[in-house]
Amino acid sequence: MIKVYGVPGWGSTISELMLTLADIPYQFVDVSGFDHEGASRELLKTLNPLCQVPTLALENDEIMTETAAIALMVLDRRPDLAPPVGRAERQLFQRLLVWLVANVYPTFTFADYPERWAPDAPEQLKKNVIEYRKSLYIWLNSQLTAEPYAFGEQLTLVDCYLCTMRTWGPGHEWFQDNATNISAIADAVCQLPKLQEVLKRNEII
């Protein structure tokens, strides 16, 4: 069985949602506190020297990291969780899958730990990065239609990102006021019976 090393509510939530949608069994291993010295960090370091979550230990003992790579792995088993090959939605799915981790993810690295990157002006860095993140979400919102999911009636793995990331900064109210498509998609995903246990355990709902 796959082991998902993560922290409730963090990026590992996205992987949990993907695996749950795909009916792939897994065991969650809580490594809360991994971002500081201690037992959790030492455990995670033995699997992933970069000490990032999610880190997945697969059935064959190989290690998988990076949520976009995990999504591609899931699609090998459940291709129906992406738009069909040959449709325009497929290209947008591929683009947004990479865009999210290449553009939005780094803003959390800098805004969550600003003192690491700008020790002389951490609050200014945090403020600037959060404003930049908002501009990214506004662009992303313009690419989506929420009918009811990111690519229409078909639920895809990109929806797992939107559902989870809405709970991170700048928060639910901001999305409701400024990124209504993202907010509506997240609401639709949060209503899926299949995901209730994972969503509650990760305090998404």
Curated annotation (Swiss-Prot):
Pfam families per UniProt: GST_N_2
Superkingdom of origin organism: Bacteria
BP-aspect Gene Ontology terms: response to hydrogen peroxide
GO MF annotations, alphabetized: glutathione transferase activity
Protein source organism: Escherichia coli (strain K12)
Domain GST N-terminal as annotated: residue spans: 1-82
Key words of the record: Transferase
Similarity comment text for this entry: Belongs to the GST superfamily. Beta family.
Record-level GO cellular component terms: cytoplasm
The GST C-terminal domain, residue ranges: 86-205
InterPro entries, A to Z: Glutathione-S-Trfase_C-like, Glutathione-S-Trfase_C_sf, Glutathione_S-Trfase_N, Thioredoxin-like_sf
Recorded name of the encoding gene: yncG
Protein residues bound to glutathione: V53, E66, T67
Protein name: Uncharacterized GST-like protein YncG
